[in-house]
Swiss-Prot record:
Lineage: Eukaryota, Metazoa, Chordata, Craniata, Vertebrata
Region (Disordered): 390-431, 450-592, 765-790, 879-915
Localization, UniProt: Cytoplasm, Cytosol; Cytoplasm, Cytoskeleton, Microtubule organizing center, Centrosome, Centriole
Record-level GO BP terms: microtubule organizing center organization; mitotic spindle organization; protein localization to centrosome; regulation of centriole replication; smoothened signaling pathway
GO CC annotation: centriole; cytosol; microtubule organizing center
Keywords: Cytoplasm, Cytoskeleton, Developmental protein
Function noted in UniProt: Plays an essential role in early embryonic development. Plays an important role in the regulation of centriole duplication.
Keyword Cytoplasm among record annotations: yes
Pfam families in UniProt: STIL_N (PF15253)
Originating organism: Xenopus laevis (African clawed frog)
Main location: cytoplasm
Record field: compositional bias (Polar residues): 390-401, 461-475, 528-560, 567-592, 770-790, 891-913
Protein name, entry field: SCL-interrupting locus protein homolog
InterPro entries referenced in this protein's UniProt entry, alphabetically: Sil
Length: 1281
């Protein structure tokens, strides 16, 4: 007998089911919410500070002085520009800032010269014209005359501006850039005597003087988050991106470290105990020093938690260690605010005027702290005046505390909040920094980011400059009275910050030079001092490689000596004080020794930053001083400061004891470099604390002369009335810095609205443009374009990789060819393709652009044409008048066109006459003129293209130059060949060729072609364009190609139109491969890209419109036809110096007829047209104009390669299988068997044998993908993008 029982109704089941459901809800809620990180309640002994090794000094000039490498070409260009005017010429030197491979120093490489342009809205200030991301800018002043040793590079305003820029970078939230921690200027005195060029070079730089010491300690547990696991793996984010990464450290209640990214919005609201870094090899890297500066002086950090000794943590994920390294880092001078240091270098240089550039053109200099007298005095005086100004401009202490919630002061909160703010009008707007620097559209009234700091409105709103510390601890001197008497000097008083013990120290200033142990790799003889018959250098500098000592012991070979006797240090202190130095009183009881030889100063500027509540209990009767209130005796260091104030930074929780004691006995580590300031015993609740007489503390091992000096402290402690923490002075409860940011953004928004309004008005006014008739004569067209562009009063320039086209000088501007056939529509087509597919590699961009040299075009013609031909063709490109805010290159070129087409043998007018109509710029017509230019570019008729190309193909119009009459029949060929050879020599290519022979041998021709193809290998970058994916997808074009049909289909569907898809389908559907003669050039908007390796940065596709016109007009690059089908033989560039043979022409013509007989009617019409063009090209190939060097890139010209029949005794290594032809198939320009080894060894071109124009090639086999781009199949596939 069985009975069914329902257990669901029992009480036990209900209870068990209820418990399980409750547990599931709890687990679900715990998984859905993020567990909060609670900082340990006790902030003492957060980690074990026991040292595990010797400490390391952190400063970018600690082990090696900064090195400066200057290009000889940049100096020559600067002298060429300077001699055009009598007054001092201001310009810019551009370069790159890099860390050395051993990470013991930094190197500044200056390789470009920029003449600069006048800044809009300012009288005489200039800005660089071709600045790229990552460029290091050095303002330079060039004067002509006899040099002097008493040259002052900086002005007081320059020093103040440098101080402000260094402080603002350390206080802000922008990405930390080590190059912005060095502000540099130069002064060059230039003298020319006969063939000698004499340069007096003066370099001066301002940097941050604060240093740190890092000591290895035992590992601290780390919470295994995703970030920590990624940094500990071999493929971490820093390794993949090829750069270093940094962030901050906090702790949870179990005293485990939590790694936080610097971009985390909550990072500034957490108590931070240190920093972490990844992608760095050594702890002494300058990147670590910069990260420590940002951690100490950042105004956005809410709370810094330091150890009992005032140190913070550093976790280094080194590239050479599997496990992270742990260090305890401490500032070397705890009570100092942000300090500055002056580095200078002086040297002389002799060059020969007409000599070639040496093989190693980089001139080496070294910046040292052994400063010049006048420069150092001005630096000291500026620091002194700025300190006095800071005291006068300090705001009065406010009696309201930030902890008082009824005070009306709103704390600025940068964390995201879902609820609306009380003041929506000042809601924070994030700045957007674009990451596409390749494309630039520059107006004459552009916004300069530097103008924010120089804006008079900002100055009136911010009554005082930036500060190195947050404002709530920055008013230590506000309520301090003036001293009644000077501090009493004593023998054991700290008078300066000394280096490690030297064998002997005297009483003069030279005794403060640091002792050097390691031979630095920087100590080598410059190459221009060894064996050079062209350069003589007088090392009169105090910072040359021989006279300047090294800055410190390298951690790789020497062991730092830490400990020493206190008596020895006292003797050193007493003997090393420089003579003639007077203490500079920073406040009533704060003084600093100022040394003229070592001008390291700490200048504090009030920072208007946000205020946050104190973590500890506020003490309104205590003064938050900058100094570390530490009393020192002979053998012990005692802390007697409050727990909620810390020197030189805001909200540094320093927990040693709960109340300030009357007697202090706690001992600190002996290697800390601390002294007792005078204001170390504040009056607290009626209790008075005293400090013992000051003794020296053992100096840290890494000290050197570049560090700031310690203050001179008196014996007695004075009572000073404490100032109260002031409130924010900004608008609507915000700080002034935040309000200034919002006001600046509001100003930019208003300006943008006004611009949009003007554009709309101009567009409405020109809604019905009148269509102009197309002139039949090209000269009439040029005159018309000039007349329309004369109305443009404001300059506009749009460019890609601006400056890349100025890599070479013109060979010989004796004759020029017409540029009518390349109109603006072709420029627009080429621009649209290459901008979308171009790779942005900053390193290659910087390396390919050598100099912005406008004058070099006109100067080189004097050397090439023996001085008998003027540089009138390029005179419109020069800018000597200071009234032009931005040069309109395209307009100047059109003006030059009209002048060259009007009359024969007329002298060229100067620049002022050409551009007389461009001086006044009415702003209301600016956008109308801009729209007129854009419409002119976009509405160019295709009929005009055909007329122009037909005219040039039939008869090649050779323009007469605006120069003195020469004898073209006798000297033209010879001059062209000499100019070509000289141009090659200037590029470092030496060709042994007899200049008297006009026709070079075929072996020399091939060698020249191979050399020209490998001149600039670093600029060869694989790009994404139509040729790139067609080559990748077809194994017939690439010897080791792979089948990437799906990717090719997807890209073709997205980027190609119907006609291009049909042509690609026809070219691959034919199994006999007869239709390959349909050149892929017709699928491209121009004929500039003929090969994969031709897609370098110095190719015409990366030039601006105006630059491309300029280069093509003067024969510097090849000219391409704007039509899609007709080939261009007129302006095709040729590497060969031999004329085309008639045999090869007839052979090509015969091959055309055979290919048409085979039934391939698709290309018959095109081949007939090409065959007709061959006849007209026979005489043109003999013309000496074609012997010019047109294309100095890595691409083989797709237009014409003329190679005479081979000789058996002179075999060609590169073109032996290539027959003479007038056009190459772009798809076959595969140069190397392995593309990754393109520019190494003997490069062999054309692995396949090309037979005429048919496009036939020996494919790898029948397995090639012939239907990759079938149109029917493409339309059926889904779009992948």
């Amino acid at each position: 007998m069985s009975t069914s029982i329902n257990l669901k109704n029992t009480q036990f089941y209900k209870e068990v089911r209820g418990v399980s459901m409750e547990n599931q809800r709890n687990l679900r809620s715990m998984s859905n919410r993020m567990l909060s990180v609670n900082f340990p309640p006790s902030k003492c002994a957060l980690w074990d500070p026991a040292p595990m090794g010797d400490p390391f000094g952190l400063h970018f000039s600690y082990y090696r002085n900064p090195r400066l490498l200057v290009s000889e070409k940049a100096l020559r260009l600067s002298s060429r520009h300077a001699k055009t005017g009598r007054k001092p010429f201001s310009c810019f030197l551009l370069g790159t800032f890099s860390v050395d491979e051993d990470e013991e120093g930094v190197t500044l490489t200056v390789d470009r010269f920029d003449p600069g342009r006048e800044k809009t809205g300012s009288g005489s200030s200039k800005v660089p014209t071709a600045q790229l991301p990552g460029d290091f800018i050095i303002p330079c002043t060039i004067s002509i005359g006899k040099g002097s040793n008493n040259v002052i590079v900086h002005t007081p305003e320059d020093f103040t501006s440098s101080f402000m820029s260094l402080q603002s970078h350390l206080h802000g939230k922008e990405a930390l850039d080590l190059a912005k921690l060095l502000a540099m200027r130069a002064h060059i005195t230039y003298t020319e005597n006969m063939d000698n060029l004499h340069f007096d070079l003066h370099w001066a730089a301002v940097t941050v003087a604060n240093t740190f010491e890092s000591t290895p300690i035992k590992p601290v547990p780390i919470i295994p988050t995703a970030l920590a696991r990624n940094l500990g793996s071999h493929n971490n984010i820093a390794h993949l991106q090829g750069t270093h990464k940094s962030g901050y450290l906090t702790m949870d209640q179990t005293r485990k470290l939590l790694l936080v990214l610097e971009s985390d919005p909550k990072v500034y609201m957490l108590p931070l105990v240190g920093i972490w870094l990844s992608g760095i090899t050594h702890i002494h890297s300058p990147q670590v020093w910069a990260a420590c500066l940002r951690y100490i002086f950042s105004s956005s950090i809410h709370e810094r938690v330091l150890s009992e000794s005032g140190s913070f943590l550093i976790i280094l994920y080194s590239l050479t260690h599997k496990e992270p390294e742990f260090y305890e880092c401490s500032p070397c001078v705890k009570h100092d605010p942000l300090g500055f240091q002056l580095l200078t270098c002086q040297d002389t240089l002799h060059l020969f005027k007409n000599a070639e550039v040496s093989k190693n053109p980089l001139l080496r200099f070294e910046l040292s702290s052994e400063c010049q007298e006048l420069e150092a005095d001005l630096f000291n005086e500026t620091c002194k005046n700025k300190s006095t100004t800071v005291f006068k401009q300090s705001p009065l202490p406010n009696k309201l505390s930030t902890s008082d919630h009824d005070s009306g002061v709103e704390e600025e909160d940068f964390s995201p909040r879902p609820s609306p703010r009380p003041h929506p009008s000042v809601q924070q707007v994030s700045r957007i920094h674009p990451s596409v620097p390749e494309l630039s559209l520059v107006f004459s009234s552009f916004f300069d980011p530097k103008s924010a700091s120089h804006n008079p409105e900002n100055r009136t709103r911010n009554n005082s400059p930036f500060s190195s510390t947050p404002q709530n601890v920055n008013n230590m001197f506000a309520g301090a009275p003036k001293p009644n008497k000077e501090p009493q000097p004593c023998d054991n008083q700290a008078s300066g910050l000394l280096p490690r013990p030297a064998p002997s120290l005297n009483t003069n200033s030279t005794a403060m030079k640091p002792s050097k142990v390691k031979s630095s790799p920087a100590d080598y003889q410059p190459p221009h001092l060894q064996s050079s018959n062209q350069i003589r250098r007088n090392s009169t500098s105090t910072s040359s490689a021989f006279s300047t000592p090294r800055s410190g012991c390298s951690p790789d070979s020497t062991v730092h000596q830490v400990k020493g006797s206190c008596e020895q240090e006292q003797n050193i202190n007493g003997s090393a004080q420089p003579q003639g130095t007077t203490p500079l009183m920073r406040s009533g009881s704060y003084s600093r020794q100022v040394s003229s030889n070592f001008p390291n100063h700490n200048v504090t500027f009030p920072l208007h930053s946000r205020h946050v509540a104190e973590v500890a209990k506020p003490s309104p009767n205590l003064a938050p001083f900058h100094q570390t209130n530490v009393c020192t005796s002979c053998h012990s260091l005692v802390s007697c400061h409050s727990k909620n104030c810390w020197p030189a930074m805001g909200h540094l929780t320093y927990h040693t004891m709960e109340n300030p004691p009357e007697t202090c006995e706690s001992v600190m580590p002996a290697y800390q470099n601390v002294v007792c300031p005078s204001v170390c015993c504040p009056q607290t609740a009626g209790k008075t604390e005293f400090c013992s007489p000051v003794d020296l503390v053992l100096l840290s091992p890494g000290r050197r002369d570049s560090l700031p000096l310690n203050p001179c402290s008196p014996h007695t402690c004075r009572h000073t009335p404490p100032p109260v923490i002031p409130t924010a002075t900004g608008m609507l409860g915000l700080s002034t810095e935040a309000y200034r940011l919002f006001a600046e953004q509001d100003k930019q928004l208003k300006l943008l609205q006004a611009q949009i309004q003007r554009l709309l008005e101009a567009q409405a006014a020109e809604s019905e443009p009148s269509k102009t008739t197309i002139p039949n004569n090209s000269k009439q067209k040029q005159v018309e374009s000039v007349s329309t562009e004369q109305e443009i009063k404001t300059s506009v320039s749009i460019a890609v990789s601006t400056g890349a086209s100025l890599f070479w000088n013109p060979p010989c501007p004796e004759k020029e060819e017409s540029m009518d056939k390349q109109d603006d529509s072709a420029f627009c087509n080429e621009f649209s393709v290459n901008v979308n597919t171009e790779d942005t590699s900053h390193a290659t961009i910087t390396s390919s652009i050598r100099a912005v040299d406008i004058h070099s075009f006109s100067e080189s013609t004097q050397l090439t044409d023996r001085g008998n031909c003027t540089a009138s063709l390029h005179v419109s490109h020069e800018r000597d008048d200071a009234s032009y805010p931005l040069p309109d290159v395209q307009q100047d070129i059109n003006n030059s066109k009209s002048l060259s087409n009007q009359t024969d043998h007329t002298e060229s007018p100067n620049t002022a006459e050409i551009d007389s109509g461009v001086s006044a710029v009415p702003p209301e017509k600016f956008y109308q003129d801009l729209l007129a230019q854009v419409n002119n570019l976009l509405k160019t008729s295709s009929t005009e293209d055909e007329m122009t190309s037909t005219k040039i193909d039939s008869g090649h119009i050779i323009e007469k130059t605006e120069s003195l009459p020469c004898n073209p029949t006798e000297n033209n060929d010879k001059n062209v060949l000499k100019a070509t050879l000289k141009q090659l020599k200037s590029l470092g290519v030496n060709i042994d060729m007899n200049t008297s022979e006009l026709q070079a041998t075929k072996a020399d021709t091939a060698d020249s072609a191979s050399i020209l193809a490998c001149i600039n290998p670093e600029a060869v970058i694989p790009r994404l364009n139509y040729m790139s994916f067609s080559n990748i997808g077809l194994s017939g074009f690439v010897p080791n190609g792979v089948d990437l049909s799906m990717e090719a289909n997807a890209i073709a569907l997205k980027y190609l139109n119907e006609s291009q898809l049909n042509q690609l389908s026809l070219s691959h559907a034919n199994k006999n491969k007869q239709s390959d003669s349909i050149s892929y050039n017709s699928l491209l908007p121009g004929t500039t890209e003929k090969s994969m390796v031709g897609l370098s940065l110095i190719s015409p596709s990366n030039m601006s419109f105006a630059t491309k016109k300029y280069m093509k007009r003067y024969g510097l690059i090849e000219s391409s036809d704007s039509s899609m089908e007709e080939p261009d033989l007129a302006n095709a560039s040729s590497f060969a110096l031999t004329p085309m043979s008639s045999d090869s022409t007839s052979e090509n013509r015969l091959f055309f007829n055979d290919s048409c007989k085979d039934g391939n009617f698709v290309t018959c019409e095109e081949q007939k047209r090409k065959n007709a063009d061959v006849d007209s090209a026979i005489g043109w190939a003999h013309h000496p104009e074609t012997n010019k060097l047109r294309n100095i890139t890595n691409e083989i010209s797709g237009k014409l390669i003329n190679v005479a029949p081979l000789q058996e005794d002179r075999p060609l290594h590169f073109l032996k299988d290539l027959k003479a032809r007038t056009k190459l198939s772009a798809g076959k320009a595969q140069f190397t068997q392995h593309p990754e080894k393109e520019n190494t060894g003997d490069v062999q071109f054309f692995h396949e044998k090309h037979d005429g124009f048919s496009g036939k090639k020996s494919l790898g086999g029948p397995s090639t993908v012939g239907d990759i781009l079938d149109v029917n199949r493409l339309r059926q596939l889904p779009k992948l993008f």
